[in-house]
Amino acid sequence: MATYKVKVATGTDFFSGTLDSISLTIVGTQGESHKQRLNHFGRDFATGAVDDYTVQCQQDLGELIIIRLHKEPHSFLPKDPWYCNYVQICAPNCRVYHFPAYQWMDGYETLSLREATGKTTADDTLPILLEHRQEEIRAKKDFYHWRVFVPGLPNYVDIPSYHPPPRRCRNPNRPEWNGYIPGFPILINIKATRFLNLNLRFSFVKTASFFYRLGPMALAFKLRGLVDRKRSWKRLKDIKNIFPATKTVVSEYVAEHWTEDSFFGYQYLNGINPGHIRRCMQIPDKFPVTDEMVAPFLGEGTCLQAELEKGNIYLADYRILDGIPTVELNGQKQHHCAPICLLHFGPDGNMMPIAIQLSQTPGPDCPIFLPNDSEWDWLLAKTWVRYAEFYSHEAVAHLLESHLIGEAFCLALLRNLPMCHPLYKLLIPHTRYNVQINSIGRALLLNKGGLSARAMSLGLEGFAQVMVRGLSELTYKSLCIPNDFVERGVQDLPGYYFRDDSLAVWYAMERYVTEIITYYYPNDAAVEGDPELQCWVQEIFKECLLERESSGFPTCLRTVPELIEYVTMVMYTCSARHAAVNTGQLEYTSWMPNFPSSMRNPPMQSKGLTTLQTFMDTLPDVKTTCIVLLVLWTLCREPDDRRPLGHFPDIHFVEEAPRRSMEAFRQNLNQISHNIRQRNKCLNLPYYYLDPVLIENSISI
């Protein structure tokens, strides 16, 4: 008779426990136990509980390799979902086996779990283990399907549970709820989130903090009448009163300094879209700036050509926005442009705008605006650039390059790598809640009647078109941060704190990934010979990059260094890249003139005509402003249930070497955090968006 001591850990989130009957079968190399119900006097499997049980077997089962958890009805009680963290079994020889689960069992089902040691296909020799990993992948591919979101954009997750059950209503003539929440100014497609699978949903705590924060704020806007006013703002200072209780050092700085050229240029380096600017070695033909135009702003003893040769001239080109039609908002036609902005990095360390053209096509009706133009001409020209920044940031840098790309990485991981695979264990913490927040994003932003349709000058179709163009230009090198800085020519630009911090985090990730990868992949042949890894990479190329070869994304990985770079890129994209463009959104956008989502007058075609009144009449109206800020406030306010970068409470790795690597990674991140905070003490405007304690492991908000 062999005795096995079993520990079963239930999740800590509300309603993780179950009243259903749970049984266990243990499979070893020398036999299999009978199915035994796990039950003792009192409540079993309560939320947060770690329950102890004893399983008796007729013989020693040898090395334990698989367990099966059977969830069945208990008496007359209704079905009750259960979240299992893990199962630990102490064998008669005192060896402890760990079986990670970290998933919901919703219905009456059997869940097979492997022992936690990370293994590639080449490491498995037992037929039962090979069959188990194949069956796991087959089951996940049957459940998780790709779905076209918008042609030309990364595909996303289409799950059978997305579709609501047949409508049951006593009155068949009763109209179906249209999706509006009373008092909320935009349509929310609740169906896109309501039927999401439990394993992809927010925790109860996160859901409650997210939605219960949204409702009261929307109601407050309604009671104050802000979402019903379709007129211009009367005074700029009134915009400060939208969020009177959410002021920060940065948001106050933005409101006070937004008109200054130095702050305008600073945002290209350390704002919320710091990856757009690039060094200019030659003025493009479509932007006919002359030395006579900009000489007064370059300093004495130099000229435009000299500054170009020194590498002090930078360009922000918004050609991706060219030619996209606009829509009407609140009964008024909106306007649009694709500006070009030339900047100069001076000896005083300031990045200063020196010329702005509000079109991609030069001509007599498209003047080049300069800092010595009238105050309101120059300010409105800069505001048009900030308007273009809104779309460059929200559509490309934020939604496309972090959320949608990250979701594709996540789905490809779930479909192609079994739980025992080392890369699954390494990357699964960086996929947490990604699908849920993207479902909310589509429900809030990218549906008919949503934010893009009701508060953006480009509307839903135009906003999607910007993302499609963004994906058509996206490259693998641009997602690998060190390569991106070199390609844009900003690798040695002083005062670029985003670059300094992102490289520090990237290299810390790279060291961590290197230690994990080299532990499981001793040579290049192990990488090239891993079919599950290769299928994961191929599916990302197919479903995320849509098989576009010009993207430079690999279709296979052949060497250990290639795998290290690829995995680091995925990890960085799903964590730090998102933090850099998301965390500061409200601080930089709460002062609406710094980040307008729409413009109500056309771009200026001549100089000297802009006044304060025309400036105010060009900015978004009160309703549009408040709709945008309400949604951004909701999406930027981090709810509870955070997991900072490097915090891995779920035990996926059990080997000593990976555990040491995880601890070393945390120590490196702590040092980076300390360095950032020490630097910020000396700055008038701190940059902390890539402080590891503020970076989430995953895209979860």
From Swiss-Prot:
Gene Ontology annotations of biological process type: arachidonate metabolic process; ceramide biosynthetic process; establishment of skin barrier; hepoxilin biosynthetic process; linoleic acid metabolic process; lipid oxidation; lipoxygenase pathway; positive regulation of gene expression
Activity regulation, per record: Increased by calcium.
Top-level taxon of the source organism: Eukaryota
GO MF: arachidonate 12(R)-lipoxygenase activity; arachidonate 12(S)-lipoxygenase activity; arachidonate 8(R)-lipoxygenase activity; iron ion binding; linoleate 9S-lipoxygenase activity; oxidoreductase activity, acting on single donors with incorporation of molecular oxygen, incorporation of two atoms of oxygen
Residue intervals of the PLAT domain: 2-119
Cofactors named for this entry: Fe cation
This enzyme's EC code(s): 1.13.11.-
Entry binding sites for Fe cation: H398, H403, H578, N582, I701
Ligase in keyword set: no
Keywords (A to Z) from UniProt: Cytoplasm, Dioxygenase, Fatty acid metabolism, Iron, Lipid metabolism, Metal-binding, Oxidoreductase
Coiled coil: none
InterPro entries: LipOase, LipOase_C, LipOase_C_sf, LipOase_CS, LipOase_Fe_BS, LipOase_mml, PLAT/LH2_dom, PLAT/LH2_dom_sf
Residue span, Lipoxygenase domain: 120-701
Primary subcellular site in the record, as a coarse category: cytoplasm
CDD domains recorded: PLAT_LOX (cd01753)
GO cellular component, one term: membrane
Family the entry assigns: Belongs to the lipoxygenase family.
Function: Catalyzes the regio and stereo-specific incorporation of a single molecule of dioxygen into free and esterified polyunsaturated fatty acids generating lipid hydroperoxides that can be further reduced to the corresponding hydroxy species. In the skin, acts upstream of ALOXE3 on the lineolate moiety of esterified omega-hydroxyacyl-sphingosine (EOS) ceramides to produce an epoxy-ketone derivative, a crucial step in the conjugation of omega-hydroxyceramide to membrane proteins.
Protein name: Arachidonate 12-lipoxygenase, 12R-type
Organism encoding this protein: Rattus norvegicus (Rat)
